[in-house]
């Protein structure tokens, strides 16, 4: 097939979930051209729905719907049957199964989906925040952060910031380097929002040597020397003491495990 498969996502919310599912499915096919996914979000009445369905009909597309209200879902399904369009209703087959199993009726409230959408936008904002204030690019961001991670180089500050951002936390991080002054803003925020990250000298040396090798530099650089590492770690501990913050050892911990410890500490203060 020379022309791409055209798929219309019709949703009374954002339609992001349907789009993810479609991409997962189409990835299983050796298509000459990527599927053309056309997302129509916030379809809340029959007029808007009909306009979108007519467009899908003209393009001979596949309709994938996530319409919470059964009235609109039925309207879309009937239109597709009459016009010989392939139609996939992602919500109502499962909704019917849950209703049959529980004896309860679906609320059919798109507002519940909107609340999920709000959560989605909060997550995107948190991710953008983490990127903007990574590595203390702008110290002013420390004042607005939910969590501030502090530690010497290669103690997982950036990956932890990204992971926590995906859980809707606004995270900034500050690298500790003996020759670089600590930003004043770090002393202007409550200590309970700051987490110090550290590790063992042996583990840090190992990680830094791997890093140097990966970028084509000499593994014997002072960056990975025992003397330099001990100096930095001691500076880190002195800084943590000044800040009065909690400290986590990250050696031999997965990012998920360290992130769980961080959120446990942060939420314990609220």
Swiss-Prot record:
EC number(s) from the headed UniProt entry: 2.7.11.32, 2.7.4.27
Molecular functions (GO terms): ADP binding; ATP binding; phosphotransferase activity, phosphate group as acceptor; protein serine/threonine kinase activity
Keyword tags: Kinase, Nucleotide-binding, Serine/threonine-protein kinase, Transferase
Chain positions recorded as ADP binding sites: 151-158
The keyword Kinase appears for this protein: yes
Catalytic activity: N(tele)-phospho-L-histidyl/L-threonyl-[pyruvate, phosphate dikinase] + ADP = N(tele)-phospho-L-histidyl/O-phospho-L-threonyl-[pyruvate, phosphate dikinase] + AMP + H(+); N(tele)-phospho-L-histidyl/O-phospho-L-threonyl-[pyruvate, phosphate dikinase] + phosphate + H(+) = N(tele)-phospho-L-histidyl/L-threonyl-[pyruvate, phosphate dikinase] + diphosphate
Pfam families assigned: Kinase-PPPase
InterPro entries, alphabetized: Kinase-pyrophosphorylase, PPDK_reg
Record-stated family: Belongs to the pyruvate, phosphate/water dikinase regulatory protein family. PDRP subfamily.
Cited NCBIfam families: PRK05339.1
Function: Bifunctional serine/threonine kinase and phosphorylase involved in the regulation of the pyruvate, phosphate dikinase (PPDK) by catalyzing its phosphorylation/dephosphorylation.
PANTHER family: PYRUVATE, PHOSPHATE DIKINASE REGULATORY PROTEIN 1, CHLOROPLASTIC
Record's protein name: Putative pyruvate, phosphate dikinase regulatory protein 2
Natural source organism: Listeria innocua serovar 6a (strain ATCC BAA-680 / CLIP 11262)
């Amino acid at each position: 097939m020379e022309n791409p498969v055209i798929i219309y996502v019709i949703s009374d919310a954002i339609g992001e979930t349907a789009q993810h599912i479609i991409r997962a499915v189409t990835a299983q096919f050796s298509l000459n051209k990527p599927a053309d996914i056309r997302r129509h979000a916030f379809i809340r009445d029959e007029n808007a729905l009909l306009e979108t369905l007519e467009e899908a009909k003209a393009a001979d597309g596949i309709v994938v719907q996530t319409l919470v209200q059964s009235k609109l879902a039925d309207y879309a399904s009937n239109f597709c049957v009459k016009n010989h369009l392939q139609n996939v209703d992602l919500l109502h087959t499962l909704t019917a199964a849950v209703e049959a199993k529980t004896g309860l009726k679906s609320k059919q409230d798109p507002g519940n989906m909107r609340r999920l959408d709000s959560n989605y936008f909060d997550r995107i904002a948190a991710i953008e925040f983490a990127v903007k204030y990574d590595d203390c690019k702008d110290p002013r961001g420390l004042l607005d952060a939910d969590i501030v991670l502090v530690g010497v180089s290669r103690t997982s500050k950036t990956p932890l910031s990204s992971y926590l951002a995906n859980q809707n936390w606004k995270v900034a991080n500050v690298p500790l380097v003996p020759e670089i002054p600590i930003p004043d803003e770090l002393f202007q925020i409550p200590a309970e929002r700051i987490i110090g990250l550290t590790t063992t000298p042996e583990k840090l040396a190992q990680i830094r040597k791997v890093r140097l090798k990966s970028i084509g530099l000499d593994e014997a650089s002072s960056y990975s020397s025992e003397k330099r590492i001990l100096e930095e770690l001691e500076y880190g501990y002195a800084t943590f003491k000044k800040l009065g913050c909690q400290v986590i050892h990250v050696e031999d911990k997965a990012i998920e495990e360290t992130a769980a410890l961080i959120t446990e500490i942060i939420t314990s203060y609220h």
